């Protein structure tokens, strides 16, 4: 549903505008009249963006939420995923929307990736956030169609433009379509390895690996921050797990 996607991203961009304006508002400003006027204008901008965002959110739910059937629009994974990821779903309906995503992904489509370049940007992190790390791991590792593992199992050395890049007719134009990787890499670093940014620019770091995934034998990961290298190396042992970390 193109209108749903456009409206959801309009709301998301308004949230970014609020953050950008707030960052400027929090910066020191000159005490002269020009500085005071700029400060006042930023405060007014924030209020305007907030009011517009609430209006968009209200209209979004009024237009796309099917109260009778308990899903958004045409009930695709992306249609339910975007409002959940962008915090547009009313609190009373969040669990219901999460269940729709799991049902569609696991039960209806046999635990395969059922979204394209738009939805896949948010799929893994939302599965983790809703507590379904088991589903996220299956999607990350299976070799069935459609999925990243299917590409690798069929000779891909980069990310295809299409999930069925080996059989598409007409053939795909791009064999290096990195955007279809979605949020898989953040999932690997932030969830599996547990290296998480807890403050802007990695000024603070949270370390929380996915020890609960018994299927994972070991993880070796590192990330270069502005303050130095962070590493997280862990492995399963007979007693539980062994974890080695280093921080700047």
PLM regions with names:
Residues 33-40, 51, 55, 134-248:
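Non-catalytic C-terminal accessory modules of carbohydrate-active enzymes
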Residues 2-5, 9-172:
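Catalytic cores of carbohydrate-active enzymes
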């Amino acid at each position: 549903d193109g209108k749903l996607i456009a409206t959801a991203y309009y709301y998301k961009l308004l949230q970014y505008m609020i953050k950008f304006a707030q960052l400027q508002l929090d910066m020191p400003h000159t005490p002269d009249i020009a500085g005071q006027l700029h400060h006042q204008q930023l405060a007014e901008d924030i209020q305007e963006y907030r009011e517009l965002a609430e209006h968009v959110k209200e209209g979004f739910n009024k237009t796309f939420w099917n109260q009778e059937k308990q899903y958004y629009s045409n009930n695709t994974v992306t249609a339910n995923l975007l409002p959940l990821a962008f915090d547009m779903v009313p609190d009373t309906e969040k669990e219901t929307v999460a269940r729709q995503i799991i049902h569609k992904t696991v039960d209806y489509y046999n635990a395969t990736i059922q979204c394209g370049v738009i939805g896949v940007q948010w799929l893994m992190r939302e599965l983790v956030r809703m507590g379904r790390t088991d589903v996220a791991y299956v999607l990350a590792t299976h070799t069935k169609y459609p999925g990243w593992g299917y590409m690798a199992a069929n000779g891909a050395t980069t990310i295809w433009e299409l999930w069925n890049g080996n059989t598409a007719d007409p053939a795909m134009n791009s064999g290096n379509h990195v955007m279809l990787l979605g949020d898989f890499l953040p999932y690997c670093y932030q969830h599996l390895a547990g290296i998480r940014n807890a403050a802007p620019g990695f000024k603070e770091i949270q370390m929380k690996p996915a020890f609960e995934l018994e299927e994972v034998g070991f993880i070796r990961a590192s990330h270069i921050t502005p303050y130095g290298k962070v590493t997280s190396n862990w492995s399963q042992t007979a007693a539980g797990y062994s974890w080695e970390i280093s921080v700047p």
